[in-house]
From Swiss-Prot:
InterPro entries for this protein: ATP-dep_Prtase_HsIV_su (IPR022281), Ntn_hydrolases_N (IPR029055), Proteasome_sua/b (IPR001353), Proteasome_suB-type (IPR023333)
Name of the molecule in the record: ATP-dependent protease subunit HslV
Organism, scientific name: Bordetella pertussis (strain Tohama I / ATCC BAA-589 / NCTC 13251)
Single Gene Ontology BP annotation: proteolysis involved in protein catabolic process
Family: Belongs to the peptidase T1B family. HslV subfamily.
């Protein structure tokens, strides 16, 4: 059975100002099932942003578990991420989930992978999903060569990814923290 998948999620940081955005498309094989899915969420009293890519049901499951870890660790992003990925690696059911998360607060941006990795990306930016490489390239160029705020960089990066990746649309949700 084919999985629902494909998206673009991108996160850009300048100091404590961070923006996380994603498109709204969900596909099943080569068919667009829905174009308005919200893949970006605010968690833990609106102090943490999370975005997901991968199989939709798997991503929702991981996001819910991450939110529970955030509550358990009183919003401490790194501890919640490490504990979630530890569970992800050791739990037989979780190990089969096909999804990735980008999570961010005003101090850290982390990528949580299906291999149980917690990665803190360089350059203050991260991107995942089928259009992630396009969005990351665009964001890096804009970050290096402009003074645009993070949300403007995320918006332009998603637009470029949507122009190039057939699994990414132009229906964007962008959330920010700090300023």
């Amino acid at each position: 059975m084919e999985q629902f998948h494909a998206t673009t999620i991108v996160c850009v940081r300048r100091g404590n100002h961070v923006a996380l955005g994603g498109d709204g498309q969900v596909t099943l094989g080569n068919i667009v099932i829905k174009g308005t899915v919200r893949k970006i969420r605010r968690l833990y009293h609106d102090k943490v942003l999370a975005g997901f890519a991968g199989a939709t049901a798997d991503a929702f499951t991981l996001q819910e578990r991450f939110e529970a870890k955030l509550e358990k660790h009183q919003g401490h992003l790194m501890r919640a991420a490490v504990e979630l990925t530890r569970d992800w690696r050791t739990d037989r059911v979780l190990r089969r989930l096909e999804a990735m998360l980008i999570v961010a607060d005003t101090e850290h941006t982390l990528v949580l992978t299906g291999n149980g990795d917690v990665l803190e990306p360089e350059h203050g930016l991260a991107a995942i999903g089928s259009g992630g490489a396009y969005a990351q390239s665009a964001a890096l160029a804009l970050l290096r060569n402009t003074e645009l705020p993070p949300e403007a960089i995320v918006k332009q990066s998603l637009e470029i990814a949507g122009d190039l990746c057939i699994y990414t649309n132009q229906n964007h949700v962008i959330e920010t923290l700090g300023a």
